[in-house]
């Protein structure tokens, strides 16, 4: 998302509060993977220390056997060792979360508000609906993670820290997959270099 699109989306989400929109806000403010957001429980959020603990992920597993096609929603461990992490809970997100946490039990899932998690495909479908309503060109849920990473780079976040926040095992993954400099960022880079030599 461009900065303008992200601002429009955040404005829309804040004016249309619901559990699924909360999931989109969490992604934009943390860069969490869709399965991690769906697996997030209230007990994973520490408002006092300002951290979110990521220890689980949710995904749908398709069963391959001779019978009819079937699948099941499973709770699993994160992707890599680096995916087990604590990430910062910024004040803006903490304020949003506090509105939802009042009515929730610690073992309930943040997005569903219940004892069972939200299906990742449900979040993907919801995001597409919001993107359509806002006229956004980006339609892939994972693009929210890319948007977070790009904003961090634009804000001069060092790559090692960003890689740790995203749960990557090495910095090259972050740079190769998630950093998308736009023309304005490229222009600023060249202008800064020119200013340093003249």
Give residue spans per PLM region:
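Hydrophobic (often cysteine-bearing) scaffold residues that line and stabilize catalytic clefts
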Residues: 5, 19-20, 119, 123, ...
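Short, contiguous acidic/charged loop-to-helix segments that flank catalytic cores in large enzymes
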Residues: 12-15, 74-84, 111-118, 135-143, ...
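C-terminal catalytic core of tyrosine-transesterase DNA break-rejoin enzymes
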Residues: 25, 29-36, 126-133, 143-169, ...
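Catalytic-site neighborhood detector that most strongly recognizes the C-terminal catalytic loop/helix
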Residues: 58, 94, 166-192
């Amino acid at each position: 998302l461009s900065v303008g699109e992200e601002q429009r989306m955040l404005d829309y989400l804040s004016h249309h509060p619901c559990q699924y929109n909360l999931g989109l806000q969490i992604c934009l403010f943390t860069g969490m993977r869709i399965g991690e957001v769906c697996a997030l429980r209230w007990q994973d959020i520490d408002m006092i220390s300002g951290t979110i603990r990521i220890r689980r992920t949710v995904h749908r597993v398709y069963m391959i056997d001779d019978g009819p096609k079937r699948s099941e929603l499973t709770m699993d461990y994160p992707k890599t060792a680096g995916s087990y992490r604590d990430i910062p809970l910024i004040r803006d997100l903490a304020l949003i979360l506090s509105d939802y946490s009042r009515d929730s039990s610690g073992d309930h899932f943040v997005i569903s508000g219940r004892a069972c998690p939200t299906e990742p495909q449900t979040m993907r479908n919801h995001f597409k609906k919001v993107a359509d309503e806002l006229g956004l060109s980006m339609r892939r849920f994972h693009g929210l993670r890319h948007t977070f990473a790009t904003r961090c780079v634009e804000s001069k976040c060092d790559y090692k820290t960003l890689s740790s926040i995203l749960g990557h095992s090495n910095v090259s993954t972050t740079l190769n997959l998630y950093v998308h400099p736009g023309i304005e960022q490229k222009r600023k880079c060249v202008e800064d270099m020119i200013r340093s030599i003249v």
